[in-house]
């Protein structure tokens, strides 16, 4: 159970700035209302509830993905869904704590 929680909330040790410079897309998986209240520049809003139905579209981007949300939990779930679909994904954690290392 603890390892599952660590996996969901873990903020992958990735240089996000480098990933973005190489074309990574930031997907904010919060609800549209949360997204409207504030979000990262250039982030795309695809709520967690829609991630599974949008996998093919995301795959067509042919780019790595960084997921973010309010706390890191939903972005961790989205990361797992996308990775299981063969999309290179990292969990960026909470959008308002997202750091470009």
Residue ranges and their predicted role:
Residues 26-29:
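Short hydrophobic beta-strand that contains or immediately precedes a catalytic carboxylate
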């Amino acid at each position: 159970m603890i390892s599952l929680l660590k996996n969901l909330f873990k903020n992958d040790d990735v240089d996000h700035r480098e990933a973005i410079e190489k074309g990574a897309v930031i997907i904010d998986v919060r609800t549209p209302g949360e997204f409207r209240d504030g979000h990262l520049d250039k982030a795309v809003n695809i709520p967690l509830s829609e991630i599974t139905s949008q996998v093919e579209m995301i795959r067509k981007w042919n780019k790595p993905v960084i997921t973010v949300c309010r706390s890191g939990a939903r972005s961790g779930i989205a990361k797992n869904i996308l990775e299981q679909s063969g999309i290179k994904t990292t969990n960026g954690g909470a959008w308002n704590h997202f750091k470009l290392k």
